[in-house]
């Protein structure tokens, strides 16, 4: 939670726009700073991401959280926790592939942890933060579906580490080419989102997975059937619940 900034004041009486209230209460230094934090999804109330136009009052402030951090995206915190839990994954001096890079939160964490080079792959265009797209250590592969990844690229680049945060597609589809291409000794640290693994029958009406643990079982079975050379070293909860409220998991793999 943010602790720096101007001397705290009191929120304005009655319901006011979120960005104005943050400044009035001294939680941020300016409306532009508030707008940036809100745009990046870092301001939440009872776990729900807020918009600048949302109206709050002083009674909401005890439940308001500002996850101000140095990363270009909130998702970076998921990989930060993964690296803490899996020190053997260390990306230091390694060439890493980031599947589903988006704005580059995972890529940024890898570079901060000493990665020599990061290949940031995403099916979208223009999403990678300038801090990453302007870094000579980053090779951006925009507009590329992970299922169409050229396996020879990984060999040419000498990729030994894989991270992934994909949405609207199962990891069993998105990561198949990369897992096949990586050589013995390679490691992967992937985010598993149950809502994209269990199928429609496994979801409640609100889109929450009925049995989140089932997603881990499905991925484990897929690995055993199609990627027997990969073994699971660790699984654990992501420190952040997905934006839609779904529980998420991290899985650490190694190719033998």
Locations of the language-model features?
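Core SAM-dependent methyltransferase catalytic element
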Residues: 240-256
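A basic, amphipathic helix-loop patch mediating RNA/tRNA/ribosome contacts
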Residues: 2-61, 95
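S-adenosyl-L-methionine
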Residues: 119-173
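Conserved class I S-adenosyl-L-methionine
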Residues: 91-102
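A short glycine-rich, Lys/Arg-flanked "PGG" loop and its adjoining helix->strand segment in the class I
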Residues: 172-189
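Short, glycine-/aromatic-enriched active-site segment of Class I SAM-dependent methyltransferases
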Residues: 194-210
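Residues at the N-terminus of the alpha-helix immediately C-terminal to the conserved SAM/SAH-binding loop
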Residues: 102-107, 124
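Conserved S-adenosyl-L-methionine
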Residues: 111-117
């Amino acid at each position: 939670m943010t602790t720096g900034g101007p001397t705290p004041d009191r929120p304005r009486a009655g319901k006011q726009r979120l960005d104005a209230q943050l400044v009035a209460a001294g939680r941020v230094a300016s409306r532009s700073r508030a707008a940036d934090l809100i745009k990046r999804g870092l301001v939440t109330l009872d776990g729900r991401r807020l918009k600048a136009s949302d109206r709050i009052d002083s009674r909401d402030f005890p439940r308001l959280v500002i996850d101000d951090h140095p990363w270009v995206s909130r998702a970076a915190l998921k990989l930060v926790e993964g690296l803490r839990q899996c020190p053997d994954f260390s990306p230091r001096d390694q060439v890493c592939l980031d599947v589903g890079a988006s704005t580059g939160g995972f890529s940024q964490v890898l570079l901060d942890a000493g990665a020599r080079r990061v290949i940031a792959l995403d099916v979208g265009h223009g999403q990678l933060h300038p801090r990453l797209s302007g870094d000579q250590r980053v090779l951006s592969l925009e507009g590329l579906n992970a299922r169409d990844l050229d396996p020879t690229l990984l060999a040419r680049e000498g990729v030994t580490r894989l991270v992934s945060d994909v949405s609207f597609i199962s990891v069993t589809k998105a990561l198949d080419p990369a897992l096949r291409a990586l050589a013995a000794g390679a490691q992967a640290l992937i985010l598993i989102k149950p809502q994209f693994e269990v199928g429609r029958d496994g979801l409640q009406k609100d889109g929450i997975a009925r049995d989140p643990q089932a997603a881990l079982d499905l991925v484990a079975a897929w690995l055993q059937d199609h990627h027997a050379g990969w073994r699971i070293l660790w699984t654990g909860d992501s420190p952040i619940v997905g934006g839609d409220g779904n529980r998420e998991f991290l899985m650490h793999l190694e190719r033998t």
